[in-house]
Every structure is written in structure tokens, then in C-alpha cells.
Amino acid sequence: MAICPELAQTDKSALANLSDETETLKNSTDEVQTSSSFSSSGGRQSSPLTSGSKLEREKQTPSLEQGDTQSELLDYKNYEKKLSKKWINYLKLKDSNFERHQPDTKLPTEITRVSDEELNALQSYCTMKINLIHRRGDSKKKTSSRHKKLHLGLDVEASERDAFSCTVPDELLNRIYFKNMRTTPKQEAAAKQHISYQCPYCNRKRAELALSAFLKQKKTLLESFLLQERIDEHLHTKDFLTRIGEAHQDFPRLSDDPRIIWKRLTEKSHIRYSGFERSETEQKLQRDGNSACHLPFSLPFLKRLTLIKPELVIVNDNV
């Protein structure tokens, strides 16, 4: 129930004024009663030995006091009636304000009028759930034999199946569905939205990622420059012509003597074939007892080729 704060303040002020007026009325009535009792007691306690003038005064004063008290009582009665009317008006106004500011509480009662079938189904479902919870608690508390435990477990499973297999009316499901549909937008609206460009953590992570991407880019650029320099250096120092020149350094010259050329070739062939270790294929062939040479060609044939090679070179040179 939502009541306006201004109305609440006015109610509080009116209530305070009425309470003050009632308090003053009580005090005044008490004073009148005490004064009337005091006057009556004073008149009774007067001694008979007083003078005549004093007696006359005493006779006159009670009549005056009685008249005053009667007028005061009439005034207080009128004031009391006015105060009671004020209280009645205040209570009526309060009831009217309460009824005026209570439309929301009546709406749910009108909306939540459901059918008897729906109420019965809901009640049966709740009772099943309560019984299931009680059975689970009892089964946990009991410490019996294995057979009893198995039996209780089967009973609990059967009761769970019965509880979950109970039919729920479509009206109840639809009502719950629409209620959830109404509450979800409210929850989404009330939820605090995360704005990435205002979040300091997101901005810090974004800066770190940008820095790492910048460093990777610069690193790849420098590596590409270094690789290009190495490729250029290799091409300039180890090009095709230099390779051909290095290969031609070992070749014999046209002005060399054929006997010197032959001597060099024989020395190279001896050094080359004497320093090699035997391969695995050669070892297998020797184990098998084969007498074939370890090379694909025999030594005499190789010598014959080496002998022929300088002649060919010489012939080409002569040509």
C-alpha cells in the first residue's frame, strides 16, 4: 500500500492536535472535580464558633461556587461533544483515504480468482511434495539393515515418480508462464547494464591487447627486414657465377702438362677411396661371403674411366 507522504503528515498533525485537546479536557475535568469536592468539604468543616458575618459569607460563597461549577461543566460537556465529533470526522477521513489509496491491493484479489480444479491440483501437488520431503528426512534418519534401506529407496523412487507424473492444469501453467513473461522485462530493466567503454577493467584490457598487437606487428616487420637482408647477402656472395668459379678452380688448365694432370687425378682418387669407411651394405655383402666389390663399378673399370677422362679433356682442349 503506497500512501502519499503529504497525507501521512496531515494525519499525524491532526492526530497530535486531537490528542493534545483530549489531554487538556481530562486535566480540566479533574480540576473541576477537585474544586467541587474541596468546596463541599470546606463548607462541611466550618466551625460553629464563627461570627455572624463569616456565616453569611459562607452561605453566599457556596451558591456562587455551585453556579460557576455548573457553567464550567456545561462548557466542558460542549467541548467534549465537539472533540468527539472531531475524532469521528478524523476516523472517517482516514478510512476514506485508506480506501482511496488502496486500488492495487484489490486488483490482485480480482486477478487471482482461480478455478476449483486449479486449486485442487495445486494443493495436491504441494501435499505430494511435502510428503516426499518428509519421507526423505525419515529415510535419512533411519539406520536399518540393507534390505530395509533398499526397500525405502524403492519407495522413495516410486513416490518421486508419482509426484512428477501428477497432472497439472493448463490454466496454472499458462498463468505461471505469463507471470514469468511479465517479470523478465522488469528484471532486465532493473539489471545494471555493462558499458564496455566506461568500464576501467575493459579499457585496461583493451590497451594491453593493442600494445601486444603493436609489438607483434613491429617484431614481424623487423624479422622480415632481417630475413631480406640475409637473402640479399646470400645472393650477392653465393650466386651462380661464384659457384661456377669455385667449381672451375679445381679443374686443370689448358697450359698444364697431361702427366701432371694424370698424377693429380690418381692422387685424388687414392685419397678419396682410402679414407671412406665401409657402408652397411658392404658389411652385409662381406658377411654373406660375396666377393663382389662394394662399389657399383669395379676398380679397374674406374681406373679405366679416370685414364680416359684426361685424354678427353685434352682432346677437348686441343679442339
Swiss-Prot record:
This is Uncharacterized protein C8orf48. Residues 21-70 are annotated as: Disordered. Residues 35-51 have a biased composition (Low complexity). Residues 25-34, 61-70 have a biased composition (Polar residues). InterPro entries: DUF4606. It comes from Homo sapiens.
